[in-house]
A protein has these predicted regions:
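Extracellular jelly-roll beta-sandwich "head" domains, especially the C-terminal globular C1q domain
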Residues: 29-203
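Collagen/collagen-like triple-helix recognition
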Residues: 1-37
Length: 203
C-alpha cells in the first residue's frame, strides 16, 4: 500500500501558561571604579613650625599645585579674596564611595635631618554644603613611609596607600587633596620640597 501525501500543517495551538520564575542568580562582580589622579607638576614646599606642627600645607590638583592656605581649627577656607592660586578642589558629579587612596612624595632638594624626623601625610578634605570651607574626611589620610630623617639626597621617596575604605561621597561634594608635614626630634622648624602625586578610587 502506498503512503499518501503529507497533509497541511494544522493551526498553532494556544500558548501555554507562563512557568514559575526561576531562582535569583548569583550577584555579579563589582563594577569598575573611577580613579581620580593628582600630580603637583612643580615641587611643593611644605613647612613645619614651632613644636613640629603643620606649617604651610600644599594643595595638589591635576598637574598643578600651590602652597596652601593655613589650616585654622581644622578648617581650610578657599574663599581667598586675594585671588591667588588656591582652588584645587573638584566636585562630585554623582554619588559614590571612596575605597582607597595612595600618595607619593619625592624630594627635590637635599636635606640634613640628623636627629630629626619629618613625616608627610596626604589628606582628603571635603565641603559637603558645598561652599568654600573644607574639613578633613575621617579615615581619608595616608601617612607616607619611610619618614624623612638623616642625610637625604635629591629623589628620596616616601609613599603610602590606604585600602578597604567605605567613605560615602555624595553628589556636589567638593574634595581637596592636601599634603602636610610634621616634625619631631632636634629641629622642629623645617622646610621640605618635593614632587607630590596621589590617586583615589571611587566606586
Amino acid at each position: 500500500m502506498e503512503t499518501g501525501p503529507t497533509g497541511a500543517t494544522g493551526a498553532t495551538g494556544v500558548t501555554g501558561a507562563t512557568g514559575p520564575t526561576g531562582a535569583t542568580g548569583a550577584t555579579g562582580a563589582t563594577g569598575a571604579s573611577a580613579i581620580i589622579p593628582f600630580a603637583s607638576g612643580i615641587p611643593l614646599s611644605l613647612t613645619t613650625i614651632a613644636g613640629g606642627l603643620v606649617g604651610t600645607p600644599g594643595f595638589v590638583g591635576f598637574g598643578s599645585s600651590a602652597p596652601g592656605l593655613s589650616i585654622v581649627g581644622g578648617v581650610i577656607d578657599l574663599t581667598n579674596a586675594a585671588g591667588t592660586l588656591t582652588n584645587f578642589a573638584f566636585s562630585m558629579p554623582r554619588d559614590g564611595t571612596i575605597t582607597s587612596i595612595s600618595a607619593y612624595f619625592s624630594t627635590t632638594a637635599a636635606l640634613s635631618l640628623v636627629g630629626s624626623t619629618i613625616t608627610i601625610t596626604a589628606t582628603l578634605y571635603q565641603s559637603t554644603a558645598p561652599n568654600n570651607s573644607f574639613t578633613a574626611v575621617p579615615g581619608a589620610t595616608v601617612t607616607l613611609a619611610p619618614p624623612l630623617t638623616g642625610i637625604l639626597s635629591v629623589g628620596s621617596i616616601s609613599s603610602g596607600i590606604v585600602t578597604g575604605l567605605n567613605i560615602a561621597a555624595t553628589a556636589q561634594t567638593r574634595f581637596l587633596l592636601v599634603f602636610t608635614a610634621t616634625a619631631s626630634g632636634l629641629s622642629l622648624v623645617n622646610t621640605v620640597a618635593g614632587y607630590a602625586s596621589a590617586g583615589i578610587a571611587i566606586n
